């Protein structure tokens, strides 16, 4: 790797041993993937995927102490992934003891570290940092040092920024150093598509299900999706951005997608079209039957597959303001149709703190809470990591949460039926 004189000086210890180790780590990372040089991080803000103070990760927090003691705060302010704990989310006494006395014993320490390292605000914890209410929205062409897979794939695909699927800690090191190795999705060639995905469904495909199918098929490759504009149109409005948020999260978690192109819709697909397809690309055709096949393939790992749901999570990734309002309208109509006032299953909707602040005082906010829905800022995955919570019959509309936990996936329509106890559910 060819370093600039300034970068070489940092590696040689010009700003101390700790900074030299940060740069050495980035150099080794780049060498692993064949990077020839470093490129500056150009986004206004960073984002860190580690937002939880797990006891087993104490060495990580010890390393962060060393960074702070060496004066190496982030070169850019940053947001962070969602917090793991919220007293409003249902837990038993024993579950709460496990959360606070066994699992997340480093939480207070870590949140104080993030303040010293440069987090933007006390409420800057969300996986959807790119939403307007949060304010960490990169521009097309910006070079990022992020790691959260759902945020990386959104920034690359919907915003046209450039970021690799980095690991936790490495992304913060990129923000501290101010540069990252250039390879993969930071390059023009690395952003070309290996797959042409033709969507031939007779109705708008469920975002989380379509993303799952594509992710499992292409894995870490870049897909170019054709035919989705039939259902979404050609404008990146609020509804479509929310759809692509959920779609992308499923591609990234059910596979390892860091970038997708949607013909006639996403920025680079609009600008370059079929030129994004690399020579020798493969084709994957998705129709209604293929989506149903994928859905049927999901394992049910509950101890009792016929158990009644005990808890429902909606919002992985975090919901947008528009999605909260849409869910409120759907639940209102569905409950009225069943002559019910409240949801039949304890239900938690998760969103960024700033989004929740904007929603709670609206008419829809009062309505949703009156229906028994709990609004929270947590990461559902962090909740499900509790071994006692894993034993619960938890349902979700998130394919990411299904993939990483014991939660059982249902489509939005199926979730509505379960929450309102529609006949047959």
Describe the residue ranges of each PLM region.
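Non-transmembrane, aqueous-exposed alpha-helical and coiled segments at domain scale
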Residues: 1-425
